[in-house]
Amino acid sequence: MKRFLFGMMFLSVVFMSAVNAENKPSGGLDHIGLSVSKLDASTDFFVNVLGFKVFGRDSKYPAAFLNNGEMSLTLWQTADDAVAFDRKNNVGLHHLAIKVPSFEALDDLYKAIDSMPEVVIEFAPELSYGGPAKHMMIREPSGNRIELIHRPSKN
């Protein structure tokens, strides 16, 4: 058993070294584009609840471009007859996970979102796979699944 654990630790170090190599062909996430059925309501949610800022709009598509200092989002308005995403039967984005700075901030978001009829809470804050991370899952006003998660630092 000790050999197995040592082997797994060795392989994970080798793998992480390979992933962190300078010659990797891709970098971090640049932005996410979400199709939304309620552009104004979804934009308001990301701005007023999650702290994003609008840095641009495109009235032709229409779209809103948002940023929170760490990530950018493009919200694209769908046609009126758009079909909702079915995570078990369609290929596509299952959910968007957004970091929250503390457990207290996660609980505060839950309390704020709980009073919003246009936002569906799939589950309240709970430990993720036994911890130490804690998360909750919601559907923003257009129905996109958003995970709000806090992972405490390892210090």
Residue ranges and their predicted role:
Residues M1-F4:
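Positively charged n-region of N-terminal signal peptides that target proteins for export
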Residues G7-F15:
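Bacterial N-terminal signal peptides
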Residues N20-D40, L93-I98, P152-N155:
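N-terminal beta-strand motif that seeds the catalytic metal site of vicinal oxygen chelate
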Residues S35-A79, Y129:
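Core segments of cupin and vicinal oxygen chelate
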Residues V36-A41, A97-S142:
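Vicinal oxygen chelate
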Residues K60, F65-Y110:
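Mid-chain, structured segments of secreted extracytoplasmic proteins
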Residues L66-G69, I138-P141, R151:
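Active-site beta-strand termini and strand-to-loop segments that position acidic
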Residues W76, Y129, I149-N155:
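Short beta->alpha transition motifs characteristic of CBS
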